């Protein structure tokens, strides 16, 4: 669906806007990153999965009034969840190298200091790792 949308947009995009680029249509993804100090990569991963499950469960509960485990599981499959290395791998596996990702870090997380740490870890650990994987460095 996404590739066909890009193909269609490249044909109909107004010339005044320049040529269509994949980055013109950001891909939205919830990010449940745990890069907290004092935890092993395995502990970070487990904590990120717990945090994602709780947040996504609350999301579906708020939308529909009941928690449907299959919907929580499906939403979790679309989110980026884990420690920095896991999220870098998920980005490379799921997204085209020219995609622009609109990452949501604060989804149901009201701890602004933690959200800031997560965003910093994403830019300092995840983004460079993705670049290294894509360039073979």
Region spans (language model):
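An alpha-helical appendage that flanks or caps ligand/catalytic pockets
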Residues: 1-99, 131-137
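Conserved strand-to-helix beginnings and helix N-cap segments that scaffold or border functional pockets
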Residues: 2-3, 113-119
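Short, electropositive alpha-helical surface patch
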Residues: 49-50, 116-124
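A generic structural signal for solvent-exposed, polar alpha-helical segments
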Residues: 65-66, 110, 127-128
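Glycine-rich, proline-tolerant flexible connector loops at the mouths of alpha/beta enzymes
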Residues: 104-115
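Alpha-helix-loop-beta-strand connector modules within alpha/beta enzyme cores
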Residues: 120-134
């Amino acid at each position: 669906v996404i590739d066909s949308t890009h193909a269609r947009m490249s044909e109909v995009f107004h010339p005044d806007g320049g040529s269509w680029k994949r980055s013109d249509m950001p891909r939205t993804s919830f990010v449940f990153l745990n890069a907290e100090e004092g935890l092993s990569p395995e502990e970070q991963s487990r904590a990120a999965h717990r945090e994602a499950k709780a947040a996504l469960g609350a999301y579906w509960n708020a939308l529909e009034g009941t928690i449907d485990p299959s919907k929580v599981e499906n939403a979790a499959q679309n989110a980026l969840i884990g420690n920095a290395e896991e999220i870098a791998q998920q980005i490379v596996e799921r997204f085209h190298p020219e995609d622009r990702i609109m990452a949501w870090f604060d989804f149901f997380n009201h701890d602004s200091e933690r959200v800031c740490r997560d965003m910093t870890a994403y830019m300092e650990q995840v983004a460079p790792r993705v670049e290294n994987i894509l360039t073979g460095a």
